[in-house]
Amino acid sequence: MEDLRRRFPTKKNGEEISNVAVDPPLRKASDALPLPLYLTNTFFLSLFFATVYFLLSRWREKIRNSTPLHVVDLSEICALIGFVASFIYLLGFCGIDLIFRSSSDDDVWVNDGMIPCNQSLDCREVLPIKPNSVDPPRESELDSVEDEEIVKLVIDGTIPSYSLETKLGDCKRAAAIRREAVQRITGKSLTGLPLEGFDYNSILGQCCEMPVGYVQIPVGIAGPLLLDGVEYSVPMATTEGCLVASTNRGFKAIHLSGGAFSVLVKDAMTRAPVVRFPSARRAALVMFYLQDPSNFERLSLIFNKSSRFARLQSITCTIAGRNLYPRFACSTGDAMGMNMVSKGVQNVLDFVKSEFPDMDVIGISGNYCSDKKASAVNWIEGRGKHVVCEAFIKAEIVEKVLKTSVEALVELNTLKNLVGSAMAGSLGGFNAHSSNIVSAVFIATGQDPAQNVESSHCMTMILPDGDDLHISVSMPCIEVGTVGGGTQLASQAACLNLLGVKGSNNEKPGSNAQQLARIVAGSVLAGELSLMSAIAAGQLVKSHMKYNRSSRDIGPSSQVNR
């Protein structure tokens, strides 16, 4: 039997061995083709892209004309045949080439019998190739470095402050090092800003970047709030004296009068991108297309793919020249929903772009939403949860608990909250201090404090009801959620749990966030009732002088500077 070995180069005195069998050239995939490679490649590539373009164009025309896709003519049949043929060629050619290249090295063998006896093989040792080894995962590159050295590296800019969590793998250690670096760079002390007692892993990548500690805000409990027959103890995070006490007095007056009642009018988060067209006529055409009821089902299916909770409710548009502002409104389950609605809007924009290629998307938000800004569109159309809350306060409760009269409250509300706000040109500010209560509950329950701007839009109405008093608050823009954002932090989650609305409601998605909005409105109702009573009775200044003043010196002389 012939001894077969891998062929090695054989030389004698630096010259080629002439009588060694010469290997045939390596086979290529193109050897099987009757035509030159560049011709066949050019032909089939051109055929492939031409047929794809033709078929996609025809498919789009059929969708526009509501023609069934399975109805084809002769040109489409030819295009399909060309597409299949070119696809098989490209796939088969690449496959053959891959097989040939992977097997070419293993196929090059020589027969030692072809070499004359007076010649010897070059049997120099060939070292085997070691397989690539994957290094085991190493510990953090800075684990063995002292904190003092890392602080110096951060100060001189060698290590970016924002990368400490990634490089160290320890969020608390990163916060401590960053804190020390900030103190040395600024020359100011952070004494008083606590570092210990907080889970920094819980905010990584979702709540706060480059932390150096956390701010302590006291949380008070007001209540019980009797709302729709259920009692709630309401957490309020605030540094304003009298706020919790005043709201608590309002809760007492409402409870003694039979409680408050709420109505959820609407639940729809909004997002309004801005898109541009070559002309105003073209922009108007797309506006009519988006607002056409016959197109809503298709657009809603595309929008709702973004989430199992997102449900498109309406699309309203406004136009400014050749710029179009479509305002999408959708329900978002128990999430506040800004990310959810933005993803759905992006899906619709991609689809509309395919229908109207001349559309230019300027921005996913065009401020017609309108987020974190006082705006007429929010005040009129609403954003988030639209809640109305009311209570009937007995005349004797007004006198004994609130220390005023029905007539005084009615007159004050008209002249202050209605006429006074109108004279000031207020937008959504026809109330005494709804933002106080909204902010306090928002911070305690992990909501976005910046959305207090529109969430505090409120119309407070106080009217006589016989001898008694009817008070109501209408709040069209309460933007809250019980999942996502700051709601997952331990302190905020505990406050949500106290209210019975922690997390999502699997049985009835969205009901937890809706209930939280009702509680916010009920708390605002109590706060409005108590403050208006204090003003009517002339107690506001006296109470604030007693409970909302601080004599503690926080000037530079009392601080310890580093």
Curated annotation (Swiss-Prot):
Note whether Glycoprotein occurs among the keywords.
yes
Name the UniProt key words of this record, in alphabetical order. Answer: Endoplasmic reticulum, Glycoprotein, Isoprene biosynthesis, Membrane, NADP, Oxidoreductase, Phosphoprotein, Transmembrane, Transmembrane helix
Gene3D superfamilies recorded = 3-hydroxy-3-methylglutaryl-coenzyme A Reductase, Chain A, domain 2 (3.90.770.10), HMGR, N-terminal domain (1.10.3270.10), Hydroxymethylglutaryl-CoA reductase, class I/II, NAD/NADP-binding domain (3.30.70.420)
Q: Where is the active site?
A: E240 (charge relay system), K372 (charge relay system), D448 (charge relay system), H544 (proton donor)
Q: Where is this region: Catalytic?
A: 147-562
Molecular functions (GO terms): hydroxymethylglutaryl-CoA reductase (NADPH) activity
Q: Which reaction does it catalyse?
A: (R)-mevalonate + 2 NADP(+) + CoA = (3S)-3-hydroxy-3-methylglutaryl-CoA + 2 NADPH + 2 H(+)
Where is the PTM Phosphoserine found along the chain? Answer: S550
Predominant location of this chain?
endoplasmic reticulum
Activity regulation behaviour: Regulated at the post-translational level in response to alterations of the sphingolipid and the sterol biosynthetic pathways.
Q: Which GO terms describe its biological process?
A: coenzyme A metabolic process; isoprenoid biosynthetic process; sterol biosynthetic process; triterpenoid biosynthetic process
Q: According to its UniProt record, what is one Pfam family this protein matches? A: HMG-CoA_red
State which Enzyme Commission number(s) the record gives.
Answer: 1.1.1.34
InterPro entries documented for this protein: HMG_CoA_Rdtase (IPR002202), HMG_CoA_Rdtase_cat_sf (IPR023074), HMG_CoA_Rdtase_CS (IPR023076), HMG_CoA_Rdtase_eu_arc (IPR004554), HMG_CoA_Rdtase_N (IPR023282), HMG_CoA_Rdtase_NAD(P)-bd_sf (IPR009023), HMG_CoA_Rdtase_sub-bd_dom_sf (IPR009029)
**Do the record's keywords include Metal-binding?**
no
Provide the protein's localization.
Answer: Endoplasmic reticulum membrane
Q: Tell me which GO cellular component terms the UniProt record holds.
A: endoplasmic reticulum membrane; intracellular membrane-bounded organelle
The pathway to which it is assigned is: Metabolic intermediate biosynthesis; (R)-mevalonate biosynthesis; (R)-mevalonate from acetyl-CoA: step 3/3
Q: In which tissues is it expressed?
A: Restricted to young seedlings, roots, and inflorescences. Expressed in root tips, shoot apex, secretory zone of the stigma, microspores, mature pollen grains, gynoecium vascular tissue and fertilized ovules.
Q: What NCBIfam families does its record include?
A: HMG_CoA_R_NADP
What family is reported? Belongs to the HMG-CoA reductase family.
What is this protein for, i.e. what is its function?
Answer: Catalyzes the synthesis of mevalonate. The specific precursor of all isoprenoid compounds present in plants.
Quote the protein name from its UniProt record. 3-hydroxy-3-methylglutaryl-coenzyme A reductase 2
Protein encoded by which gene? HMG2
